[in-house]
Swiss-Prot record:
Catalyzed reactions: Transfers a segment of a (1->4)-alpha-D-glucan chain to a primary hydroxy group in a similar glucan chain
GO cellular component: cytosol
Subunit structure: Monomer.
CDD domains: AmyAc_Glg_BE (cd11322), E_set_GBE_prok_N (cd02855)
Family annotation (NCBIfam families): branching_enzym (TIGR01515), PRK05402.1 (NF003811), PRK12313.1 (NF008967)
Gene responsible for this protein: glgB
This protein's name: 1,4-alpha-glucan branching enzyme GlgB
């Protein structure tokens, strides 16, 4: 036996306790010459071959029958490139020895990782194809600073943790191993001995591809190439442009009729993209597509943040879906969940035995609403892991924006917690200062590295400055969901029209704070699940009134300042709640089944999108008081509202809504500019299955004072309807 290696050291490899394999394995200088030591459980013989010439150098001695081999090359003083001829019974193969290769992570990379200032840590950590000393392979790296030992296991080594223990870099807490001949598509995990001596089998947090549940392995996959931002996509994201978002859950938008199984990314591209284009939406927003273990979470409890879910195909197929959207002139937004993660054992929980990604104290680290764990945003490596993930989706898949989920739960330490269930910040306050800094940092990274991409916050409180620049003390988002507007207006619409007069302010209150943030008006998936009923189901009255109410509400929403978001199925007034396990009720568009009602709503949404895109007053000055003026704000008795939308070049559209089933004929509205106003939309049109009350295409102003204005128009406002009147150019 070699005197340089003790039996205890050898035993450490086989009981998986040796955390420094490169100190023993590979080439080492000794007094007698270069000594080569290898670990290959179950091998019978081992011969060293000079790589360049193919010449046999020496046969190694088996010093431990479990598979530890040693041999000295006498008088050899220089390291050289070699291969190993391994004999397994009667079979032999020539392999590269992973332990002859030098470290590939440099000091600067380690420093940047530890500082949390590496812009793209996914280019360093995880599994990456590369070449070392002329040998192709995959370099695996994992951050697990408190583990005693880490091995890479997978299809390439029979999932045997003894075979490929990794090199530890104490400066950064990163483990590394270059594995020659590892190939695309092979499955792998990291086997850790944690700080307490427990064995843990973990998926790669930076994996670019992962198995479909219930399997949990990572898959070797190439880092996708960068997708450059185009001027067309950048322009479509601007605050002065029309943004109408179709929110989609890919697993239930449409399914295979034969087996109710999911469509794949390519099938979705074939069917969804033309539909969205035809309907006039400018953006698609996908519910989260990072790999997640539980279907019922809809993607909002992800574990494989860098892996597009394999439910619908490969990462390459998802890139094709995004590309197809861009070719159709549609931008793509992705729901993104940096607020919490599930406690599945193969994931991030207690990763190296310590609370590495989460907080140790459940008052900070446990989310009781969702039974999930909360990220430790104060840890550099965790903050960087998350913020760079947003950039990854934008750069590597061409996604045009992210919608950040549950921001309120991140920025408040007492979110959904009773007294005594949370820990104040260092100043005694309730704000999560580390999370706030993380949000600012993430938005800075997005906007500095991917100019033109947008970030949208789902933030349900009145936290100030969500869409203000970070240099002005804001969080730096481009847009914020207007949850207040959504809750108020839906509460109003649920009321029987006879009672709406007593809640008139619910439809007007949003303008009090309209210019405090840049808003998106969201009718999202959250409003059509968990016993809340569908949007149609929320509307009062008989069938005619339900559909009329919904059409009037949509008209009001598309006329109101703010970008638009509509969850799938609402564009044709699906009657039942959304079910993530089934396709939407497309059969309702069959007039023999739906009676034409649903098709009428579909036509309306399509027309609303077209009118919205073609008329600058409806979108250009959403965030400026110059773009809006109440004309009728106080007619609670009749539940009538009228306001004017304006563009920067003087174009004007008047939006008039009547939320009672009583038509209002000869209703006088004061106008700011005298002239003729053409009716460009009427939600009561027979084309939408309405009663067809209207204004015969046009109304002219008269010099009759009304609502404090010298001129006015007399209009017929249909029952439960919204009308758009556009000032005709002179």
């Amino acid at each position: 036996m070699t005197t340089a290696v003790t039996q205890a050291t050898i035993d450490g490899f086989f009981d998986a306790s040796n955390g420094d394999p490169f100190a023993t394995l590979g080439m080492h200088e000794t007094e007698q010459g270069i000594e080569i030591r290898t670990l290959l459980p179950d091998a019978n013989r081992m011969v060293v071959i000079e790589r360049e010439s193919g010449k046999e150098i020496t046969e190694l001695d088996c010093v431990d029958e479990r598979g530890f081999f040693v041999g000295v090359i006498p008088n050899c003083r220089q390291f050289f490139a070699y291969q190993l001829q391994v004999f397994w019974g009667n079979e032999a193969q020539i392999i590269e020895d992973p332990y002859r290769f030098h470290p590939m992570i440099d000091d600067l990379e380690q420093w940047l990782l530890s500082e949390g200032s590496m812009l793209r840590p996914y280019e360093v950590l995880g599994a990456h194809f590369m070449e070392c000393d002329g040998v192709s392979g995959v370099n695996f790296r994992l951050w697990a600073p408190n583990a005693r030992r880490v091995s890479i296991v997978g299809d390439f080594n029979y999932w045997d943790g003894r075979r490929h223990p990794m090199r530890f870099h104490p400066k950064s807490g990163v483990w590394e191993l270059f594995l020659p001949k590892a190939s695309l598509g092979q499955l792998y995990k990291f086997e850790l001995i944690d700080c307490y001596g427990n064995l843990r089998l973990k998926a790669d947090p930076y994996a670019f591809s992962s198995q479909l549940r219930p399997d949990t392995a990572s898959q070797i996959s190439a880092l996708p190439n960068v997708v450059e931002m185009t001027e067309q996509r950048r322009q479509a994201n601007q605050a002065n442009q029309p943004i109408s978002i179709y929110e989609v859950h890919l697993g239930s938008w449409r399914r295979n009729l034969e087996n109710n199984f999911w469509l794949d990314y390519d099938q979705i591209a074939d069917e969804l993209i033309p539909y969205v284009k035809e309907m006039g939406f400018t953006h698609i927003e996908f519910l989260p597509l990072s790999e997640f273990p539980f279907d019922g979470s809809w993607g909002y409890q992800p574990l494989g943040l860098y892996s597009p879910t394999s439910r619908f195909g490969s990462p390459e197929a998802f890139r094709r879906l995004v590309k197809r959207a861009h070719e159709a002139g549609i931008n793509v937004i992705l729901d993104w969940v940096p607020g919490h993660f599930p406690s599945d054992t193969h994931g991030l929980v207690a990763f190296d035995g310590t609370a590495l990604y989460e907080h140790e104290d459940p008052r900070e680290g446990y989310h009781q609403d969702w039974n999930t764990l909360i990220y430790n945003y104060g840890r550099n490596e965790v903050k960087n892991f998350l913020s760079s993930n947003a950039l990854y989706w934008l750069e590597r898949f061409g996604v045009d924006g992210i919608r950040m989920d549950a921001v309120a739960s991140m920025i408040y330490r007492d979110y959904s917690r009773a007294e005594g269930e949370w820990i104040p910040n260092q100043y005694g306050g309730r704000e999560n200062l580390e999370a706030i800094e993380f949000l600012k940092h993430t938005n800075w990274k997005i906007h500095s590295e991917m100019a033109g991409a947008i970030s949208i916050a789902e933030e349900s409180t009145s936290f100030a400055g969500v869409t203000h620049p970070s240099e002005d003390g804001g969080l730096g988002f481009n847009f914020k969901w207007n949850m207040g507007w959504m809750n108020d207006t839906l509460a109003y619409m649920k009321l029987d029209p006879i009672y709406r007069q007593y809640h008139h302010n619910k439809m007007t209150f949003g303008m009090v704070y309209q210019y405090s943030e840049n808003f998106v008006l969201p009718l999202s998936h959250d409003e059509v699940v968990h016993g809340k009923y569908s949007l149609l189901g929320k509307m009062p009255g008989d069938t005619w009134q339900k559909f009329a109410n919904l059409r009037a509400y949509y008209g009001y929403m598309w006329g109101y300042p703010g970008k638009k978001l509509l969850f799938m199925g609402n564009e044709f007034a699906q009657g039942r709640e959304w079910n993530y396990e089934e396709s939407l009720d497309w059969f309702l568009l069959d007039e023999n089944i739906g009676g034409g009602w649903h098709k009428g709503v579909l036509k309306l949404v399509k027309d609303l999108n077209q009118i919205y895109q073609k008329n600058r007053p409806l979108f250009e000055l959403d965030n400026s008081p110059e773009g809006f003026d109440w004309l009728v704000v106080d007619d609670a008795a009749n539940s009538v509202f009228a306001f004017e939308r304006r563009s920067s070049n003087g174009e004007r559209i008047i939006v008039v809504s009547n939320f009672t089933p009583v038509p209002r004929h000869n209703y006088r509205i004061g106008v700011n500019v005298a002239g003729k106003y053409e009716e460009i939309l009427n939600t009561d049109s027979m084309y939408y299955e309405g009663s067809n009350v209207g204004n015969f295409g046009c109304v002219a102003s008269e010099k009759i004072e009304s609502h404090g204005r010298e001129n006015s128009i007399s209009v017929s406002i249909p029952p439960l309807a919204t009308v758009y009147l556009r000032l005709k150019a002179k």
